[in-house]
Amino acid sequence: MTTQALQDHILFQTGYLVNGIWKTLDTTFDVLNPATGEVIAKVAKAGKAQTEDAIAAATQAFPAWRAKTAKERSAILYRWYELIIENKSWLGRLMTTEQGKPLKEAEGEVEYAASFIQWFAEEAKRANGEIIPPIKPGSRILATREPIGVVAAITPWNFPMAMLTRKLGPALAAGCTGVIKPANNTPLSAFALLTLAKQAGVPDGVLNTVAGNTHEISDAIMASRDVRKISFTGSTSVGKTLVRNAAETMKKVSMELGGNAPYIVFEDADIDAAVKGAIANKFRNAGQVCVSVNRFYIQETVYDKFVNKLADAVKALKVGNGLEEGVVVGPLIEPSAVNKVREHVDDAVARGATVLAGGKPHLLGGNFWMPTVLGDCHEGMKLAEEETFGPVAACFRFTSEDEVIQRANNTPYGLAAYFYTQNLSRVFRVSQAIESGMIGINECAVSTELGPFGGVKESGLGREGSVLGLEEYLEVKTLHIGGL
């Protein structure tokens, strides 16, 4: 499918959405294909005025949407889920074209995105309240759950569809309306999903979206007293700014922020399984994943075996345009991402790391970087302290369980962690000691619509997905009834 064929599709939108109408602006910004540098769209560059219009539309639509029964909202959500699945092939190609990840991964993300809509279509019917034992005769105490109101969802470029639905699924299920600010690198994926939402029966004004002038959009959202909740996925530094600004109007916040995930391979681990898990986790989306491993800790007795197997497997990974057959590692999102990877690799090598695979820009040039394995890494290197967000596996040695737990926890972040062992006692001991919101044990994937997703320490606030995800969009109201 050519870029022109994508552009001719009914789901290809380039404006901003307010009250069910896609509008254009004279001022636009370019959306680029990270694999080729081609301009694939010129998108309306929205700012303060457009954001205020979007907030007003969401505010006006809120009473009617919250008044719908849970069963009615559930039916609309389920139809949205069906439409996403029906359009999986086209949506996957759109995502690969604007984001870069291999087509198989992109189609997998479409299914993953749809799973949140399906899940919360069911959870919409379970926003239950409570009957509390009264304190005196002739009285009752009831606790009800009600939608919080207008929600602002600020989504990232690395999972432009799944992070959108992980927020909008529970928001709509709860009875909230919203304003969506997708990342400027990947707005087209969000626009396509919102077009399908309208087709599914989401009323005009319930979902609105603006992209463009990030500072103006953010400032308008944070200043509005009508916006009662912020849900953000992105960097810790930006998240902290949003939390500070949210305090001015006491908005509720959900923050899914940065990580520095450890991946511990104990000497009793199944080494082949650990290598397979490392490849699947570290090089998915070219390492541009918030729960991607940043530090591989391998016990001294199995270090050489693990890193040699890992390096051999990494050398066999095919790099290229995600639309090409067999490609498993696509480009990084933009030149600044390449520069950060280069900075981390060069710093590590200068401080004594050994390049076991890759370690330099790919011959394809542009935003491509060779999948890399670095051995003999140690604390003090930039890649040990900062999230690389690229296809670099940094390998560290350790000797004892107590030592590696201390080193794994020696970070302000606590989003995800992983370890491999066949010792059941160690499974419980280490999982309790690791300071992280999610832990994969002999498992490289920790995100599903069924399980709570979120971090501790400076990696976030709140949880997404699961039965807890709906709670983030509800307020509890207590009713004290007398004279019965």
What are these regions (language model features)?
Residues 237-378, 441, 483:
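ALDH superfamily catalytic-core signature
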Residues 38-127:
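Glycine-rich loop-to-alpha-helix module at the N-terminal edge of alpha/beta enzyme cores
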Residues 1-34:
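Hydrophobic face of amphipathic alpha-helices that form TPR/SEL1-like repeat modules
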Residues 34, 48-51, 70, 88, ...:
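Residues at or immediately preceding the N-termini of alpha-helices
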Residues 37, 73, 95, 117, ...:
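Residue-level signal for inorganic ion chemistry
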Residues 40-46, 61-67, 153, 263-266, ...:
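Short, well-ordered beta-strand elements within core beta-sheets of diverse protein domains
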Residues 129-273, 398:
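Rossmann-like NAD(P) dinucleotide-binding subdomain of oxidoreductase/dehydrogenase enzymes
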Residues 38-42, 227, 264, 318-319, ...:
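Conserved C-terminal structural/oligomerization subdomain of aldehyde/semialdehyde dehydrogenase
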